[in-house]
């Protein structure tokens, strides 16, 4: 999918993108961890950087934050070049990289006070609001060594908010959260975006990215293989239909002989049918329904469905493995 760069990043980050990289590469000896990455993170988006563990996601984030040098390529954060303008670029950036670390013998509030002391005076005034925002106001005066991993993740987000960030960079932020915490986290991210902030979220969890993010880059073995809106990337995949009949065993036989059918699988709701990419989906779906009727099958449910981001991701990465 092509990306229209639109307005290029300008000083202060007033352009269309808050993160832009070109040819960004990082090598560790003979191993290429990040391979020629061109990344464009639109302003005001929830952007998922999606890939399996070991795909180079954390390494890219560390380069954006100036924590490790790139081997080659260029990058801009909020319109400023990193690492040359790192301090100014990161002034309005909040980040969690890997597991957030704190002083265990201090309370959550005291840890934030230590961080705020190194920032502008207004940072201290944001502590209470940040703790409330992440759901830790009732536990803020407990020592962090008593916090669960999920609570430390929340405290890490609170720490990020002390900068009143235009950009939040979160590396695997749902680690350690229970299902209720994950649901609250999704709402929190949506709230940040509604306020005009941009969130760059690195994750290997496809389902979470699809539920949280509106933009995504799919990364595999250090390379960005596709990027764009979640809706467009899923829609670019093979069309599918879900059909349930009076006799799904016979229906499988009908589908097996239809030229438009690529794959089919039985699910609790019926038969999931993936159509070939070279057929016109609407005509093929109509013809499948007609064949079912001619075979004497009663159709209980028939629905054209959108491929999930997970299905699209597996389609892309499996194709890359075959080409390797």
Regions of interest found by a model, annotated:
Residues 98, 201, 243-244, 301, ...:
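Small/polar loops that bind or transfer phosphate-bearing groups
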Residues 117-120, 214, 260, 297, ...:
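Non-catalytic alpha-helical coupling and interface elements of nucleotide-dependent molecular machines
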Residues 144, 268-269, 305:
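Residue-level "edge-of-site" marker
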Residues 123, 138, 262-263, 299:
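Residue-level detector of short coil/turn "hinge" positions at structural boundaries
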Residues 15-21, 26-220, 226:
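ABC transporter nucleotide-binding domains
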Residues 186-276:
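ABC transporter nucleotide-binding domain
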Residues 2-9, 279-324:
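C-terminal coupling/interaction segments
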Residues 102-103, 276-279:
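Short histidine/acidic/glycine/proline-rich micro-motifs that form metal-
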């Amino acid at each position: 999918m092509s990306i229209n760069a639109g307005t290029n990043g300008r000083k202060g980050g007033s352009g269309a993108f808050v993160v832009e990289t070109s040819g960004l590469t990082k090598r560790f000896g003979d191993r290429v961890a990040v391979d020629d990455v061109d990344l464009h993170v639109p302003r005001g988006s929830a952007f998922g950087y999606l890939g399996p563990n070991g795909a180079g996601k954390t390494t890219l984030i560390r380069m954006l934050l100036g924590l490790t040098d790139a081997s080659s390529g260029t990058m801009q954060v909020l319109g400023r070049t990193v690492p040359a303008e790192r301090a100014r670029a990161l002034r309005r950036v909040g980040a969690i990289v890997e597991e957030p670390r704190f002083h265990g013998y201090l309370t959550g509030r005291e840890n934030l006070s230590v961080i705020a002391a190194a920032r502008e005076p207004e940072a201290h005034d944001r502590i209470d609001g940040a703790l409330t925002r992440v759901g830790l106001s009732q536990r803020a005066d407990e020592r962090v060594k008593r916090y669960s991993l999920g609570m430390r993740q929340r405290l890490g987000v609170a720490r990020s908010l002390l900068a009143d960030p235009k950009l939040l960079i979160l590396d695997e932020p749902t680690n350690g959260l229970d299902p209720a915490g994950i649901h609250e986290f999704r709402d929190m991210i949506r709230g940040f975006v509604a306020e005009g902030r941009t969130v760059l979220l690195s994750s290997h969890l496809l389902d979470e990215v699809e539920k949280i993010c509106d933009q995504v880059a799919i990364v595999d073995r250090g390379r960005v293989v596709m990027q764009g809106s979640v809706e467009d990337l899923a829609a670019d995949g093979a069309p599918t239909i879900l059909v349930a009949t009076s006799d799904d065993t016979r229906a499988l036989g009908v589908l097996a002989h239809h030229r438009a059918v690529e794959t089919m699988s039985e699910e609790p709701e019926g038969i999931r049918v993936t159509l070939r990419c070279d057929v016109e989906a609407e005509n093929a779906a109509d013809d499948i329904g007609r064949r079912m009727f001619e075979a004497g099958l009663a159709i209980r449910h028939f629905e054209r469905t959108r491929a999930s981001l997970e299905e699209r991701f597996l389609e892309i990465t499996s194709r890359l493995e075959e080409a390797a």
